[in-house]
Amino acid sequence: MPAIVSCLTTSYGRFGGQAAVEHLRAAGLESLELPIRTAGTGSPFGDEPLVTTDSSLADLKRVERLFDDHAIRIASCNVTSGNPLDRGVVAITKRKLELAHHLGVELVVGGAGEADELQSLAQLYRHLTEIGDYAAGLGITYCFETHPGICQNHHRMLETMNALEHPHLKLNFDTANILYYNEGVNGEIALAKVCHHVRHMHLKDSLGEYGQWHFPALGYGGAVDFVRVLEIMRPCGFNGPYSIEIEGLAGEGELSLKEHQRRIIDSVEQLQNCGYFD
């Protein structure tokens, strides 16, 4: 059975969501991961958001028409907003969950946060449980990013999952971030340890060097065994979304839309060769 393969719109760099909607089908995909941005905040990629926390019902209808016109579906939303230890981030996250629900999305990706002291960690857990309960009421599962903090590596992911035990708080495993944020980690072994908690994945390649910003088209980094990733996840009952994420290389200049599209096409071809579409 073919997996659900999508693409995070920031993979198109400064061309963003509009370009993703217009060009993904030509790259062989029909689904994407849509960021819902916090109004008034900039994007590190320089792209214009399709949806923000200030989006009106009319704005959402325009976005839905855009997707319908290009026969593209939203597989998930990215609702990253900051550290949920902050009460304000919880409120923003709830707003983003409401917007995702309006768009018919059942999976979102967002930060799990970080806390240095036991008292702060207990508060973070309470805030995440509140987010999970709110997501559950909307029929959504919130999937934690592989970012610094309580989901930085597989050890902390398991600790967090066991502490929360919430059916609507799960993991988004990022195949490159696990190497970028941790030294001496085997990414596929880490994935195997937590695969039963994974409900969403970011497929991202790298050189495998700790702290080195090098996230090219899939297959051009060499540190991630995408065949092995599929072999691990299929027996766990996971069939996607596998969301392609390409963040580029440190020091490279701005790419043209054609160059971004080439990276997406190359990534799709890599996954085809690895059996994701079989």
Identify the residue ranges that each predicted region occupies.
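A short acidic, helix-capping loop that chelates divalent metal ions and anchors anionic groups
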Residues: 41-46, 83-85, 114-119, 180-182, ...
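A short, acidic, flexible beta-alpha connecting loop/helix-capping segment that sits on the rim
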Residues: 12, 243-262
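C-terminal helical cap(s) of enzyme catalytic domains, especially alpha/beta-barrels
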Residues: 256-278
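Acidic/histidine-rich catalytic cores of soluble enzymes
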Residues: 3-5, 21, 32, 100-102, ...
